[in-house]
């Protein structure tokens, strides 16, 4: 990936257990820690302003693209407010009232059942990739597409470029959050090959975004994870004569791996930045080479000249 490396980030929340995706998305999207299962909200019920809210207030276009459903924890953390990440009706209503211009996720029965409500909220709605281009003239678009899994009919890289083309029509700029949500899902199930293929898909998406950027100097790309899952360790060991090799993407090589956990861990994750070299001098957010996950929000505020 053609990106510059920056400090590792810390995945935190208010309790002592490892963060869930709702709390970590809230931290990155709002700059505040909360408890697990809460989305865009403090433990006392206070609703938090997200980076999408800030961008909307500046007249910028906003968008979310995910291989998960739009009611998943990460997209919800950037666009909704509720005490429970599983409160689907509340999540959907909050998300549709968020003002986010583009909502794109994998097909979901709850979203499909609310197609009329989605359209009543002013969204151009489509369930076929062939119909995506037809929504470009609308101020708001809702794309429900087959994006899930390693054999997805629609590729995350392709739809991410469509999202960039849609949002970049706004001359005031845009903020777009893209999620490859299946690395986490496969690691939860200790499905190593699925996790590798999902990371490869993320890499292809990053490359597509970089190619789209070309020589542009007005767009910054941040790449990170909300947490690690499974305690995965991988090593390259000597080969033994009776080992069965697995060929992945035309490459046959022996790798040894182990999952040390069945859930999220507190392992620090990487942050990669293209377009700027940030000045990490705020000791409240950055200390000894580690940036708090809440610092992602404040970094984005700085990029929007809002801090």
Where are these regions (language model features)?
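Short amphipathic alpha-helices and their capping/turn segments at secondary-structure boundaries
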Residues: 52-56, 130-134, 160-171
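Functional beta-strand-loop-alpha-helix junction segments that form "active/interaction loops"
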Residues: 126-160, 195
